[in-house]
């Protein structure tokens, strides 16, 4: 285990903004995590677990211990009907999806190129193109950070919702995801109802065809974090009431929306685009010109630049549509998690 003091976080989050933390530890075993929690030097400090740092913005120096998950390994067993995968939490998610497809295991291909680690996937209940992690997840293994004992949670225990789970609520900061279990059906059924996947000819449909198309679309629309700092989709797609949608669609007949939970889920990228915000910048932070849902670090921006840009976008969408955008990216201040509303209120 490596432990660094007053460490730079620039290489540990995909926004690539220069920021620091008091301590940074890179762990490759559960015992490493237990030893950190038992170390008197760290017990009173705020702690934050990171995978690839692909969904986080450090708004200032983090005055605590950042723990980077590098628990690696995966195994496959099978039943008559399913492939059963056990995946360590530090495994790279895009590499896992590509490996599954190459091995002939379908069902996961819609989730190609979502940045991050396997251990982060259930926290966010990652999803794309009509598939969410909850559709594939059979269990999540966690380390209880109070008892320092491991346990297995069923998918039902995880209380998955839209970009949501029990790990953001009742179990927030109370456990560390060590591994996940995935169940991929041997009898493959395509999920091709969304966007560009509908254009794949029926006789060409396969896990690999969907995987290739998803990768193609993502690479065309989404900037590579290795080249342009970003955290993927910055805002969640908001869910509004049917009445609100009916009022809006009378004025905006081309509004992009889908039925969801007795309401309508509106495409946040469409809302931002319709406000004329593609390409707009605040210093070195920019709304991506190709995909308005992504905020990028195009010129050594500061966290303050990203916060100001996010605030501008949120306000513009509210003024035009009376829809409140909620950021999907986690904001971290000196002591732990915060949000845009709290930052705005303090200014």
From Swiss-Prot:
Which family is it part of? Belongs to the MurB family.
Q: What main location does UniProt list?
A: cytoplasm
Function as written in the Swiss-Prot or TrEMBL entry: Cell wall formation.
Gene Ontology cellular component? Answer: cytosol
Q: List the disulfide bonds.
A: none
Q: What class of enzyme is it?
A: oxidoreductase
Q: In which pathway does it act?
A: Cell wall biogenesis; peptidoglycan biosynthesis
Which superkingdom is the protein from? Bacteria
What residue stretches are annotated with the FAD-binding PCMH-type domain? 15-187
GO BP of this protein: cell division; cell wall organization; peptidoglycan biosynthetic process; regulation of cell shape
Keyword check for Transport:
no
MF-aspect GO terms: FAD binding; UDP-N-acetylmuramate dehydrogenase activity
Q: Which reaction does it catalyse?
A: UDP-N-acetyl-alpha-D-muramate + NADP(+) = UDP-N-acetyl-3-O-(1-carboxyvinyl)-alpha-D-glucosamine + NADPH + H(+)
PANTHER family in the cross-refs: UDP-N-ACETYLENOLPYRUVOYLGLUCOSAMINE REDUCTASE
Protein localization: Cytoplasm
Protein name as annotated = UDP-N-acetylenolpyruvoylglucosamine reductase
EC number of this enzyme: 1.3.1.98
* Required cofactor(s): FAD
Catalytic positions are 163, 233 (proton donor), 328
């Amino acid at each position: 285990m490596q432990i660094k003091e007053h460490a730079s976080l620039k290489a540990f989050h995909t926004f690539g903004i220069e920021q620091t933390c008091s301590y940074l530890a890179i762990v490759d075993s559960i015992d490493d995590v237990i030893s950190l929690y038992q170390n008197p030097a760290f017990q009173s400090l705020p702690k934050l677990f990171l995978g690839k740092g692909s969904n986080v913005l450090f708004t200032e120096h983090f005055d605590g211990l950042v723990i980077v998950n590098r628990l690696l390994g995966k195994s496959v067993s099978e039943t008559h009907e399913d492939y059963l995968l056990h995946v360590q939490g530090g495994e790279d998610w895009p590499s896992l999806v590509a490996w599954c497809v190459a091995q002939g295991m379908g069902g996961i291909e819609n989730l190609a190129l979502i940045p991050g680690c396997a251990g982060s996937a259930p926290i966010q209940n990652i999803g794309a193109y009509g598939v969410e992690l909850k559709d594939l997840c059979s269990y999540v293994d966690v380390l209880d950070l109070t008892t320092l004992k491991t346990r297995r949670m069923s998918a039902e225990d995880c209380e998955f919702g839209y970009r949501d789970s029990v790990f953001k609520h009742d179990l927030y900061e109370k456990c560390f995801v060590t591994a996940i279990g995935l169940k991929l059906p041997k009898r493959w059924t395509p999920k091709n109802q969304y966007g560009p996947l509908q254009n794949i000819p029926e006789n060409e449909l396969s896990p690999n065809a969907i995987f290739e198309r998803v990768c193609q679309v993502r690479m065309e629309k989404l900037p590579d974090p290795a080249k342009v700092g970003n955290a993927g989709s910055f805002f969640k797609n908001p869910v509004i009431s049917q009445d609100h949608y009916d009022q809006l669609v009378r004025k905006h007949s081309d509004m992009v929306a889908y039925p969801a939970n007795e309401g309508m889920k509106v495409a946040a990228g469409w809302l931002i685009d319709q406000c004329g915000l593609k390409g707009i910048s605040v210093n070195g932070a920019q709304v991506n010109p190709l995909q308005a849902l992504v905020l990028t670090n195009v010129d050594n921006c500061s966290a303050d630049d990203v916060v100001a840009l996010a605030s501008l976008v949120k306000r513009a969408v509210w003024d035009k549509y009376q829809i409140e955008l909620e950021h999907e990216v986690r904001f971290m201040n000196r002591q732990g998690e915060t949000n845009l509303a709290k930052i705005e209120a303090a200014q």
